[in-house]
């Protein structure tokens, strides 16, 4: 799903990023006027998602050279992102921000949330 040239509504999500001193927040202000890829996945500690995250991680430098930031997004907490990053060899390669959409704001905005 493409949201090129669309305005993103205000949001503020907690984030984990390997190498950052602490958790931090990412908002629409951080992505305004910049190329960004939001990669949504269902949940941390699943069997399929690490493969896709590892693939994005292996191409991360290419995206950065093009001026594109990658954000992975799930409804798990930023603490869970950190724990998964520490536990999984594949997810441990991720250097881009892992956003916690635990209130479903961004997932609903991008229309990727599947209600249970």
Report residues per predicted region:
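Chalcogenol-based redox active-site neighborhoods
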Residues: 1-116
């Amino acid at each position: 799903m493409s949201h090129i040239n669309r305005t993103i509504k205000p949001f503020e999500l907690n984030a984990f990023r390997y190498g950052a001193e602490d958790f931090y927040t990412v908002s629409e202000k951080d992505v305004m006027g910049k190329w960004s890829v939001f990669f949504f996945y269902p949940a941390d500690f699943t069997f399929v998602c690490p493969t896709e995250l590892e693939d994005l991680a292996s191409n991360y430098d290419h995206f950065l050279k093009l001026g594109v930031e990658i954000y992975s997004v799930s409804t798990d907490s930023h603490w869970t992102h950190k724990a998964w990053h520490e536990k999984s060899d594949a997810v441990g390669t991720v250097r881009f921000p892992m956003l916690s959409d635990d209130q479903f704001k961004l997932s609903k905005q991008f229309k990727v949330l599947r209600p249970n």
